[in-house]
């Protein structure tokens, strides 16, 4: 299943509606007549790509492996440049809420939502995982998602080679794409 993200991001998406973020679900089939509810954990996967593209090897391939391991999975293909921070953090927060809202339908344990990311996607996962309680995410959750900040907090993080180093060792290209015209203001 694919879905376009839009709630709370309408003004952002008016600029380039064809570049909206998408969510793709990978949900194991349920057979309620033959099995008890399993309440699987779910992994939200954020592929890397320097905020310029989404690496194909870090999306569906990871989701299929998670299914094999007993998890349900969602791939969040978040907005890329020219969209800049904090758009992607809002999209990740929306995705956590969306998964929790569908937990019963998908036989997912709503208290076992893991946010995973690779490279730039790891940066995004780390951002929501550490910033969910701050004013920016809390006000977005309340105003646009109609929920408390705790509802968009991931229950765990899985970070694969995240782009989280700043200063002279930072992966500059990722941060240029993420911050756009605000690059000089925020980079160090």
Language model features: what each stretch is:
Residues 39-48:
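Short beta-strand element of the alpha/beta-hydrolase
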Residues 94-175:
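Primarily recognizes the serine-hydrolase "nucleophile elbow" in alpha/beta-hydrolase
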Residues 54-56, 61, 76-110:
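Catalytic nucleophile-loop/oxyanion-hole region of alpha/beta-hydrolase
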Residues 41-42, 67-77, 114:
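A fold-wide structural signal in alpha/beta-hydrolase
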Residues 17-34, 41-42:
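A short loop-to-beta-strand scaffold at the N-terminal edge of the catalytic core in hydrolase folds
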Residues 29, 49, 72, 77-81, ...:
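Short beta-to-alpha linker loops that shape the active-site pocket of alpha/beta-hydrolase fold enzymes
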Residues 2-13:
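Single conserved hydrophobic/aromatic residue that forms the stacking wall/gate
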Residues 184-188:
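Serine-hydrolase catalytic core
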């Amino acid at each position: 299943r694919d879905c376009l993200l839009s709630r709370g991001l309408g003004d952002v998406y008016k600029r380039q509606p064809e570049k909206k973020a998408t969510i793709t679900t990978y949900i194991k089939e349920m057979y309620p007549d033959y099995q008890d509810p399993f309440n699987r954990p779910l992994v939200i996967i954020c592929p890397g790509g320097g905020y310029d593209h989404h690496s194909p090897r870090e999306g569906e391939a990871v989701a299929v492996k998670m299914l094999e391991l007993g998890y349900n999975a969602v791939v969040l293909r978040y907005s890329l440049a020219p969209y800049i921070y904090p758009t992607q953090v809002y999209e990740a927060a929306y995705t956590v809420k969306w998964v929790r809202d569908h937990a019963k339908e998908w036989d997912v344990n709503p208290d076992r939502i893991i946010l995973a990311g690779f490279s730039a996607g790891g940066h995004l996962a780390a951002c929501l995982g550490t910033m969910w309680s701050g004013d920016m995410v809390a006000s977005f959750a309340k105003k646009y998602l109609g929920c408390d900040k705790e509802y968009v907090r991931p229950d765990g993080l899985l970070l694969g080679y995240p782009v989280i180093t700043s200063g002279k060792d930072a992966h500059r290209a990722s941060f240029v794409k993420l911050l756009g015209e605000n690059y000089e203001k925020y980079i160090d």
